[in-house]
């Protein structure tokens, strides 16, 4: 099954809403419409930027989409600081990232919570980008495939086969995030294939064949082509490089098969 590549730019805690507008305008200017026929491009800004991004995307009829960096497992109520999927849907979000390693590490989020957040995203019409990935000690011990498969199972617990078939999975080895270290294309393919095989067990091979599995971890315009060229890697969750409109547009164009804009 042919899967359209997805390039998702995770801005993390960077850029106020004025800077967000400037960056989206830069991406839109640098990446002509023709590329969007071959690659889906989305930005994942901080919550405070979403309304500004929505206004720009809707007003200029841009083809890029946007999403949120997290979503609450709760619909509404006395949950100070939480953001409901219903709010994100009203803002026109397409995606919600859940289970990013920084949420798992700094906010003690476990697989059960990640699965609950993924379910909440689906409930409100959002597509969850479900993140998994191993630490360096697991990689060096040679247990990375088993670790990621187990984390995948836990992070999808309770979802229906149809929901699993509609999710996006992002493999981000923790040791490669923001470090400049990048898993080789072969390393990325090894884990992403194991992810797809397990999705086949959890849902069905037919549904698994349609799931987009992304790689994340120090992705840039120099390495994205080889990574996305792997059989089971369908795009990238991009961190630092997504804050540079020119570089983000370039790597999106590369994922689309070129030529460079």
UniProtKB/Swiss-Prot annotation:
Q: Which Pfam families match?
A: TIM (PF00121)
The main location is cytoplasm
UniProt keyword Heme, yes or no: no
InterPro entries per UniProt: Aldolase_TIM, TIM_sf, TrioseP_Isoase_bac/euk, Triosephosphate_isomerase, Triosephosphate_isomerase_AS
Keywords in alphabetical order: Cytoplasm, Gluconeogenesis, Glycolysis, Isomerase
What's a GO cellular component annotated to this UniProt protein? cytosol
Q: What does this protein do?
A: Involved in the gluconeogenesis. Catalyzes stereospecifically the conversion of dihydroxyacetone phosphate (DHAP) to D-glyceraldehyde-3-phosphate (G3P).
Q: What is this protein called?
A: Triosephosphate isomerase
Please give the organism.
Mycolicibacterium vanbaalenii (strain DSM 7251 / JCM 13017 / BCRC 16820 / KCTC 9966 / NRRL B-24157 / PYR-1) (Mycobacterium vanbaalenii)
